[in-house]
């Protein structure tokens, strides 16, 4: 049997992916980030909590309690870490869980922090157990134990640290160990944004990019952005390109609609991968329930990518259900794809009684 290698080729980058597409895009994101809480749009409850906690810490001239931010990618966890440091008037040191391979990597960061500084660890759920063990006394007592020497002559010494705030970010809060999770005094979940909130973000970003955009054009981009600011800003830049080449440079509702159709982003913000996932569940697995590994194999995508990037929005919007027995396509998914659901589902009841 001949195997076509194209069947196993990685999927092309998605314009509606919440992950940064390139270092260049990360640089653009940094330029568009709000710098202070007053500039931050959305996440009203989280913003209010941080205003109070930061204000209290600043008033007492103490380090802010350690903060855990979790939620789907692209919702502003990194942005909030920068804002927290800016509001406190302290330095920010940034790293990620996979980078901290050895205890000495973390020790080097911790011992160089100044009083009340913020240490931001992205993907904190990916810290190795040995590094995580070093972090516990640092978070509780502002102390770390490090080993000096090797072999029989090795000994442990205790180093005092300056008070600091750890801001941890993760898309997989369930993968955090209980001891680590319990050491965060402030825990905040970031939710998907409403189209109205994203329209404000698009308008702000358009102003910074000097893009002429009317309200209807901005809202057309916002409503297809999957509740995610990173996607909204990316779509804004792609629609800007279309407007400059196919129009007069101004983003109107019509221009935005045509550009997004060209990009294969439908009115719900779904792209080819979203539709492939829903079609696979409906057509290949009779609507489900189907296990995640089977779904991943059927559409040629990584399990983690489906779970972290594709699924959350489909579930949040009510097109997919995650059950103990597997994934199930909802009636909304059938309607969106123009497929007649089985009679047992047409009345709103699940085919499998789940």
From Swiss-Prot:
Keyword Hydrolase among UniProt keywords: yes
Head domain (RuvB-H): region residues: 267-354
Alphabetical keyword list: ATP-binding, Cytoplasm, DNA damage, DNA recombination, DNA repair, DNA-binding, Hydrolase, Nucleotide-binding
Binding site for DNA: 303, 322, 327
Documented EC number(s): 3.6.4.-
Region (Large ATPase domain (RuvB-L)): 5-193
UniProt GO cellular component terms: cytoplasm; Holliday junction resolvase complex
GO annotation, biological process: DNA recombination; DNA repair
GO molecular function: ATP binding; ATP hydrolysis activity; four-way junction DNA binding; four-way junction helicase activity
Matches recorded under InterPro entries: AAA+_ATPase, AAA_lid_4, DNA_helicase_Holl-junc_RuvB, P-loop_NTPase, RuvB-like_N, RuvB_C, WH-like_DNA-bd_sf, WH_DNA-bd_sf
Subcellular location: Cytoplasm
Chain positions covered by the region annotation Small ATPAse domain (RuvB-S): 194-264
Signal peptide: none
Catalytic reaction annotation: ATP + H2O = ADP + phosphate + H(+)
Region of interest called Disordered, as start-end residue ranges on this chain: 1-22
Family, per entry: Belongs to the RuvB family.
Function statement: The RuvA-RuvB-RuvC complex processes Holliday junction (HJ) DNA during genetic recombination and DNA repair, while the RuvA-RuvB complex plays an important role in the rescue of blocked DNA replication forks via replication fork reversal (RFR). RuvA specifically binds to HJ cruciform DNA, conferring on it an open structure. The RuvB hexamer acts as an ATP-dependent pump, pulling dsDNA into and through the RuvAB complex. RuvB forms 2 homohexamers on either side of HJ DNA bound by 1 or 2 RuvA tetramers; 4 subunits per hexamer contact DNA at a time.
Domain text: Has 3 domains, the large (RuvB-L) and small ATPase (RuvB-S) domains and the C-terminal head (RuvB-H) domain. The head domain binds DNA, while the ATPase domains jointly bind ATP, ADP or are empty depending on the state of the subunit in the translocation cycle. During a single DNA translocation step the structure of each domain remains the same, but their relative positions change.
Record's protein name: Holliday junction branch migration complex subunit RuvB
Provenance organism: Variovorax paradoxus (strain S110)
Gene (name only): ruvB
């Amino acid at each position: 049997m001949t195997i076509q290698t194209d069947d196993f080729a990685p999927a092309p980058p998605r314009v509606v992916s919440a992950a940064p597409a390139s270092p260049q895009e990360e640089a653009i994101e940094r330029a568009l980030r709000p710098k202070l809480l007053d500039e931050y749009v959305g996440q009203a409850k989280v913003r209010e909590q941080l205003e109070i906690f930061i204000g209290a810490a600043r008033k007492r001239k103490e380090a802010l309690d350690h903060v855990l931010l979790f939620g789907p990618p692209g919702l502003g966890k990194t942005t909030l870490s920068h804002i927290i440091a800016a509001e406190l008037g302290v330095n920010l040191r940034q790293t990620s869980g996979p980078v901290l391979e050895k205890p000495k990597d973390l020790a080097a960061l911790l011992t160089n922090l100044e009083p009340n500084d913020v240490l931001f660890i992205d993907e904190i759920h990916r810290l190795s157990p040995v590094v995580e063990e070093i972090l516990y006394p640092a978070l509780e007592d502002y102390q770390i134990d490090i080993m000096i020497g090797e072999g029989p002559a090795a000994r442990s010494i205790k180093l005092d640290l300056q008070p600091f705030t750890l801001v941890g970010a993760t898309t997989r809060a369930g993968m955090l160990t209980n001891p680590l999770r319990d050491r965060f005094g402030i825990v905040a979940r970031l939710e998907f944004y409403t189209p109205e909130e994203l329209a404000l973000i698009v308008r702000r970003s358009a102003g910074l990019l000097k893009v002429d955009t009317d309200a209807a054009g901005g809202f057309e981009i916002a409503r297809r952005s999957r509740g995610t600011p990173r996607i909204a800003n990316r779509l804004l830049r792609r629609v800007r390109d279309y407007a400059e080449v196919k129009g007069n440079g101004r983003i109107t509702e019509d221009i935005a609609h045509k550009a997004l159709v060209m990009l294969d982003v439908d009115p719900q913000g779904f792209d080819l991968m979203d539709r492939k996932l829903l079609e696979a569940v409906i057509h290949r697995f009779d609507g489900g329930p189907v296990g995640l590994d089977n779904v991943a194999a059927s559409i040629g995508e990584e399990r983690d990518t489906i779970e972290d990037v594709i699924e959350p929005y489909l579930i949040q919007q009510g097109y997919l259900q995650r059950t103990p027995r597997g994934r199930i396509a909802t009636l909304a998914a059938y309607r969106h794809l123009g497929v007649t659901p089985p009679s047992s589902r047409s009345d709103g009841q699940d085919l499998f009684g789940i």
